Amino acid sequence: MKTHPRTVLIVTAIFSLLLLSAACSLNDLKTPERRERGLVIVLPGIEGPSYWNYNLARGLADGGVENAIEIYDWGTRIPGGMLINLAAYERNRTMAASLRDYIVTYLKDHPGRDVHVIGHSGGGGIAVLAAEMLPADRPISSVILLAAALSPDYDLRPALKNTRRGIFNYYSQLDAAFLGVGTSVAGTIDRKHTPAAGAVGFDRPGSESADGDLYRKLQQIKWDPKMRGYGHMGDHMGWTQPAFVRRYLAPLVAELGRPDDFE
């Protein structure tokens, strides 16, 4: 039976609204008191604000992160716009610049506070683009990448320079559907058709390279079968499972934080 195009659009619109509604109840994580302690920005994948990044934000809070936690919607609201979010490179650079401006404004208003940017899937690409655009005098604390849809040979040096604690790349070779076949066919955020760094990790320069010291700020964490005990089966969305976030990501953010080092 042939599906009418209008039906597809309606179903897509309803699905998009359901995803968006899941992320609308985080106001208690964005209070002025929390913003005074620091800021964690969660960047969704190409699906936009959703159940998965809501779980990620809640898992951080439940795991003891006391900073403000916000979901930053960088994607288009057009129904069925996921491919636009993946493929519109110049638009994505513009959205990354807007995120950079948002971060700089926060740091001006809250000097010395920590800012951590956590990007899932396509949001990982936006996180890196925004970090590399930051002014040298406004570094952020860290970038945490979960199943990042960036090419493995992407040059991380500009982003690494603008992070105090570095970039943490969480990847899984079991993420073959989205970040193996998917990005090989549809492309990565940086528009290369290849398995993504969220599946195979980022390339590192050789030990003789002058960039070796800078790349020491890149930490790569491969999915481990032990993570199954916390709801993460190695799949694309497993990084957002609340139990995994509480056990692995919340302690990392807390460890990287500097709550007593305000200027």
What residue ranges belong to the model's regions?
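Short, low-complexity, disordered segments immediately C-terminal to signal peptides
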Residues: 29-35
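C-terminal motif of bacterial Sec signal peptides marking the signal peptidase cleavage site
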Residues: 21-23
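Bacterial N-terminal signal peptides that target proteins for export
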Residues: 2-11
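Serine-dependent carboxylesterase/thioesterase catalytic core
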Residues: 46-197
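C-terminal catalytic-base region of ester-bond hydrolases, centering on the histidine
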Residues: 178-263
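Hydrophobic membrane-insertion alpha-helices, especially the h-region
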Residues: 13-17
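Bacterial signal peptide processing site
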Residues: 25-27
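Short beta-strand element of the alpha/beta-hydrolase
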Residues: 38-45
